[in-house]
Structure formats: C-alpha cells, structure tokens
Amino acid sequence: MNESTPNPLIASRFRGFLPVIVDVETGGINAQTDALLEIAAVMVRMDWQGYLRPVGTLAHHVQPFPGARLDPASMAVNGIDPDHPFRFAVPESEALDAIFREVRREIREVANVSWGQRWG
C-alpha cells in the first residue's frame, strides 16, 4: 500500500472523521461583515507509520462579497490587495463549492478503499 492509499488507522485516530487542513485569509475577524479573501484546503492520508501526509491541495482567491468590510489592520497583516489584476478571484460560493466538492470526493475515495479492504 502506498502513502496515497487510505490507512484504516486514520478512522480510529480521528473517530471516523477525515481530517482536512483549512487555512483562510480574511479582511477582519467578523464572519458576518468581513470578507473572506483566500481559502485553501489540504487533504491528508495517514501512512502505515501513523504520519499524516498531504495528498492534495486546493486553493482559491476569493472576491469580497458586496458591502464586505476590509479592516485596514487585517489587510496590513495579510498583505492582500483584493483589487490586484492577477488575483483571478472567484465568488465566495464558487470557492467554497470547489473545496467541499473535493472534500466529498476524498471522503468517497477513502470510504471505498476502506470498504474494499474488508473484502480483499
């Protein structure tokens, strides 16, 4: 079994949940008023030594929603220019849909391999 094949130990370590590492950059700390500017998710699998290894990364620059607040202090920390022409940002819903679609695909793949190992 290679490192990209799911290890059944991951289910016991994470109580059946698939760990996904998520990082976001925002225009502030209030989810109701401040913009989501970047999101990234890293899918991981556990190797046979019990170490988590990245197997896929998905990242998007996100367009601030209409009326979103961009706190100057937050923008100074993250250094993001939301108007940069090479950002190629997508709407928040598109970015989140893409991330969730990949997570669901990964869950199905892990479940199928785990199910198949019972019969293998």
Over which residues does each language-model region extend?
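Conserved non-catalytic scaffold segment of RNase H-like nuclease domains
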Residues: N2-G120
